[in-house]
């Protein structure tokens, strides 16, 4: 009897543990219903590019492939693969957004194409017309003529939360209607050379061929367009990026209405604020976008912005990282008034600006070595010289001093290099060698001091600290 009671007690404990584990477990989502509802409106996109020898040249990514950095690659298949005339090859994905046949995809999927073909899940193959494309956002709008087209519901990427489940459907490596799932890893990611898109980062498996396909939330609404991956192998490594559908809709509507996208323009070059820069500009913590240069005649110039200003808010949106500012400005309509909060020498102020239209291109500047050097006899241990008139014109600056030689000391520790141009020190303009020595002689010791330099045509602030002698 005692033995039975003993085994009964053990059995009850074991059953209790099993029930407890089941109660604590979280059921994984079932994607089957979502996939069945949405797949018919996902399409496979093929392109043909005609070449001089009457053969066909097919692209996974367009003619700009060689210019795209290895670090963030668009999705390409076998580049520059030749086939017979008019032979098509799968290049990417897209999805239907309206009953009258409008389709969203990536610009790099259709860039350089002479003909575009769309294949639906019901095996219909249609010729698509390119309505418009936008390289800066990597988006393109196509249109097909057909009846009874399935359409996807569009969600709001602004309501997407980190940790939320998301699903991708596309044609990786030509395997049509492949379904992968994961979670939102981060929002508002800024990628190199992609200033105007706050990307959604996910761990959804994305590979060549998924490009242009939809990213769904659990309600089956499109919240993003799969666009890029981080890879060192050419394939998926757990980091994928999607264009928010809110951004895509704005671009699509402009392309449909006018065939082009107008973006707001402020006319500043900005950089990140680190701990040392925050201290030198009297900020309580690293935040905002530090203005390194104000372009002459730009909206920022007309509004009175200055190098050294830190933009901490734009139209009520707090700027934590400098990368958050460009896409906010870009989505502001040209001619619209915008309000900013700016910290200047430790004091916060309100600045109103009328946003301009982003120019088609943005030319850089270059420096030309020349001129006479001044002896190294200053607290920074630098040898500097005046800029020539040709250098000033080339760099579009009123003045500054060129660093001829750097000796061990505070400037070397701060990272100043030969051929750097010093424009200001501790928020004091430096236009000549004489001004340079005058400013340096009055620098306080033991404090973090901002120094504005121009290096290879690019302005940037660095932090200098003079130690007690």
From Swiss-Prot:
Q: Which InterPro entries match?
A: PDZ (IPR001478), PDZ_sf (IPR036034), Pept_S1C_Do (IPR011782), Peptidase_S1_PA (IPR009003), Peptidase_S1C (IPR001940)
Q: Where is the signal peptide?
A: 1-25
UniProt GO cellular component terms: periplasmic space
Cite the Pfam families for this sequence.
PDZ_2 (PF13180), Trypsin_2 (PF13365)
Q: Which residues bind substrate?
A: 209-211, 266-270
Q: Per its UniProt entry, which superkingdom is the organism in? A: Bacteria
Quote the catalytic residue positions.
108, 138, 211
Q: Which residues form the PDZ domain?
A: 255-346, 352-457
The protein's Enzyme Commission number: 3.4.21.107
Q: Which reaction does it catalyse?
A: Acts on substrates that are at least partially unfolded. The cleavage site P1 residue is normally between a pair of hydrophobic residues, such as Val-|-Val
Main location group:
periplasm
Q: Tell me the GO BP annotations in alphabetical order.
A: proteolysis
- Gene Ontology MF terms: serine-type endopeptidase activity
Alphabetized, the UniProt keywords read: Hydrolase, Periplasm, Protease, Repeat, Serine protease, Signal, Stress response
Q: Where in the cell is it found?
A: Periplasm
SMART domains, from UniProt?
A: PDZ (SM00228)
Q: Which family does it belong to?
A: Belongs to the peptidase S1C family.
State what this protein does. Answer: Might be efficient in the degradation of transiently denatured and unfolded proteins which accumulate in the periplasm following stress conditions.
Return the protein name.
Answer: Probable periplasmic serine endoprotease DegP-like
Query: Which species is listed as the source?
Result: Hahella chejuensis (strain KCTC 2396)
């Amino acid at each position: 009897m005692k033995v039975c009671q003993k085994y009964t007690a053990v059995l009850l404990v074991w059953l209790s543990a099993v029930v407890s584990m089941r109660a604590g477990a979280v059921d994984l989502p079932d994607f089957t219903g979502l996939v069945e509802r949405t797949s018919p409106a996902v399409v496979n996109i093929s392109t043909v590019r005609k070449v001089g020898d009457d053969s066909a040249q097919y692209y996974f990514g367009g003619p700009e492939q060689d210019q795209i950095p290895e670090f963030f690659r668009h999705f390409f298949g076998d580049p520059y693969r030749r086939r017979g005339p008019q032979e098509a090859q799968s290049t990417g994905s897209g999805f239907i957004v309206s009953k009258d046949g409008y389709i969203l995809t990536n610009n790099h999927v259709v860039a350089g194409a002479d003909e575009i073909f769309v294949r639906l899940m019901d095996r219909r193959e249609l010729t698509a017309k390119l309505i418009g494309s936008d390289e800066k956002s990597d988006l393109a709008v196509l249109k097909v003529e057909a009846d009874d087209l399935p359409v996807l519901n569009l969600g709001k990427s602004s309501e997407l939360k980190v940790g939320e489940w998301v699903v991708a459907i596309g044609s990786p490596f030509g395997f049509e209607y492949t379904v992968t799932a994961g979670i939102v890893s981060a929002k508002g990611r800024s990628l190199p050379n992609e200033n105007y898109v706050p990307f959604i980062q996910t761990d959804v498996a994305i590979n060549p061929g998924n490009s242009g396909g939809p990213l769904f939330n659990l309600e089956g609404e499109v919240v993003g367009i799969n666009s890029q991956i981080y890879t060192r192998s050419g394939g998926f490594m757990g980091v994928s990026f999607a264009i928010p559908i809110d951004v895509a809709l704005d671009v699509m509507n402009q392309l449909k209405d006018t065939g082009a996208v107008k973006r707001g323009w402020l006319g500043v070059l900005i950089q990140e604020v680190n701990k040392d820069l925050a201290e030198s500009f009297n900020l309580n913590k690293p935040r905002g976008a530090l203005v390194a240069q104000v372009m002459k005649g730009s909206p920022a110039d007309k509004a009175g912005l200055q190098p050294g200003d830190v933009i901490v808010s734009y139209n009520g949106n707090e700027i934590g990282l400098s990368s958050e500012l460009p896409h906010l400005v870009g989505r502001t309509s040209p001619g619209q008034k915008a309000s900013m909060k700016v910290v200047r020498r430790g004091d916060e102020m309100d600045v109103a600006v009328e946003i301009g239209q982003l120019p088609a291109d943005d030319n850089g500047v270059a420096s030309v070595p020349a001129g006479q050097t001044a002896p190294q006899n200053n607290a920074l241990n630098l040898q500097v010289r005046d800029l020539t008139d040709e250098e000033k014109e080339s760099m579009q600056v009123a003045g500054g001093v060129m660093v001829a030689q750097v000796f061990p000391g505070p400037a070397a520790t701060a990272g100043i290099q030969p051929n750097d141009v010093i424009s200001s020190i501790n928020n004091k303009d430096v236009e000549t060698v004489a001004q340079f020595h005058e400013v340096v002689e009055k620098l306080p010791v033991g404090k973090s001091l901002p120094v504005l330099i121009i290096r290879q045509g690019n302005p940037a602030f660095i932090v200098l600290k003079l130690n007690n002698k």
